[in-house]
A protein has these predicted regions:
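Acyl-donor (CoA/ACP) binding surface of acyl/acetyltransferases
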Residues: 14, 226, 263, 295-336, ...
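Aromatic (often tryptophan-rich) hydrophobic motifs at membrane interfaces
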Residues: 206-293, 407
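Conserved active-site alpha-helix within GNAT-family acetyltransferase domains
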Residues: 102-116, 269-286, 412, 437-453
Length: 466
């Protein structure tokens, strides 16, 4: 299973090579955004299948970035690892800020998926040459502002900024705060984070520059090269120096745009003023981002169905099943083959008479699993559980029968009926199962109604396909 660790500045040198070659053209696929907005995104990371996998936690919900490929990266295998992680952890699978050109393949990958694409999420993408030159009639306004700025400040010059302790930067932030008129908490937070990002100049991950006029900085900018895109994280200019803003935009693009076809000036944060400003610079494209909320076939079920076989009935669990179900769940000798120790989930909580039944009955409303009570003449003798989705039309299935009813084929009968229902009524593409190699009875049961699908040191694996 994937194991994540927190994404912090300390991990920047390890992660920057992924972002340096990432050509998704979106600002979220940059180290700077992850660091600058870490208190909102809460990003954690891991590496698998030659890819960087980012798990964000936004407003209490886990969402995953599209995998970022390394030199030998396999996006499909990385997605499969994310799917398995969510299935094992009983988490919803949500892929956020997916590049638009990746969305179509993901829609085909997932049988049940909701796709969301909102205008405010889009990044503003500009041809580097356009911003570096401001050529043609369409940019006459920007050129006029720059010409006025240079007439007012004939000594104005662009300078590279590499020292986080540069006293000119300290003076600029003091001047900027004195003129800062926005009162919203997000704007104030962004300003504080911008200053913090400049403290990372000596890492070599970012490029930065400023416009000098009369010996002091009147505009600054900081960006990051990601593939063929220069992602501009920060642009600030003093309001008192008209024309400083387009001047820094042009000079920065000319200085640092080499090797980059695109400049990403990020989204507009739903701010009308920002949107107006970004549109005035005539973006060549809007970088679309798609959110995919992946569901499962359980989403279409309104209730746990009832199934009938020659001897058995499979139904939802009932309150009257409590004692028999407790006995089934507390049978340690048999449940070692179940692969789950209830004590792990129980933790420090007391074991009550209703614990097992309540836990099982909570699975279906959350669409985590379908728990079937296996009944012989109405009496609960075991259960079949359809659980752990792979989000691609497959579920795992397990079965356990009380010891006093073992040896009569009830497990095989119940398991086969549930698998057939899952494939032909629920509409799954596959049902998989596994058993410990020492569990010969389960191996025989699974072999009778499924086909072998490999083994490892611990398990035999089986599957049944439509």
């Amino acid at each position: 299973m994937l194991e994540f660790q927190e994404l912090t500045v300390k991990e920047g040198a390890r992660l920057r090579p992924y972002y340096e070659t990432c050509d998704y053209r979106l600002c979220e696929y940059s180290l700077g955004v992850k660091l600058m907005w870490r208190d909102y995104l809460h990003p954690w990371f891991t590496e698998a299948a030659g890819c960087l996998i980012i798990r964000n936690c936004i407003e209490g919900q886990y969402v995953f970035d599209y995998p970022i490929l390394g030199p030998e990266g396999d996006a499909g295998a990385a997605l499969a690892a994310i799917e398995q992680y969510c299935g094992d952890k009983e988490l919803p699978l949500v892929l956020s800020v997916v590049p638009e050109d990746k969305a179509s393949q993901l829609v085909l990958r997932y049988p049940r998926v909701t796709v969301i694409s909102e205008r405010p999420w889009k990044d503003y993408l500009y041809h580097t040459e356009d911003l570096a030159q401001f050529a043609g009639r369409r940019y006459s306004g920007q050129r006029n502002h720059i010409n006025k700025f240079r007439r007012d400040y004939p000594d104005a010059a662009f300078v590279a900024l590499t020292d986080p302790n540069d006293p000119r930067l300290t003076a600029f932030w003091a001047d900027y705060e004195a003129e800062f008129h926005k009162t919203g908490p997000l704007a104030k937070q962004e300003l504080a984070l911008a200053q913090e990002m400049f403290s990372l100049l000596d890492t070599g991950w970012f490029c930065a520059g400023g416009m000098l006029a009369e010996g002091r900085l009147v505009a600054v900018s900081l960006a990051e090269k990601c593939g063929g895109t220069l992602v501009n994280h920060i642009e600030k200019a003093l309001y008192s120096h008209a024309g400083a803003y387009p001047a820094i935009v042009q000079a920065f693009a000319a200085c640092y745009g080499g090797g980059c076809d695109w400049i990403n000036r990020e989204d507009d944060a739903r701010d009308k003023g920002l949107r107006t400003s970004k549109l005035q610079y005539l973006p060549a494209a809007l970088g679309g981002k798609v959110r995919l909320q992946v569901g499962t076939e359980l989403d279409i079920l309104k209730r746990v169905p009832s199934l009938k076989t020659e001897r058995l009935t499979l139904t939802a669990l009932r309150p009257s099943d409590r004692d028999a179900y407790n006995a089934l769940c507390l049978d340690d000798d048999r449940n070692r083959w179940w692969g789950y120790d209830y004590r792990t989930g129980l933790g420090d909580k007391p074991l009550t008479e209703d614990y097992f039944l309540a836990a099982a009955k909570a699975d279906f409303p959350a669409r985590r699993a379908v728990n079937f009570a296996v009944r012989l003449k109405g009496k609960l003798i075991g259960e079949v559980v359809l659980y752990r989705p792979d989000f691609r039309g497959g579920f795992e299935q397990g079965c356990r029968i009380a010891p006093e009813y073992a040896g009569h084929g009830y497990g095989t009968e119940a398991f086969a009926a549930a698998a057939d229902w899952a494939l032909y009524h629920l509409g799954l593409q596959r049902v998989v199962a596994k058993c410990f190699k020492e569990n010969e009875a389960s191996r025989r049961m699974l072999s009778s109604c499924m086909r072998p699908n490999g083994e490892d040191d611990t398990y035999y694996y089986f599957e049944k396909l439509v």
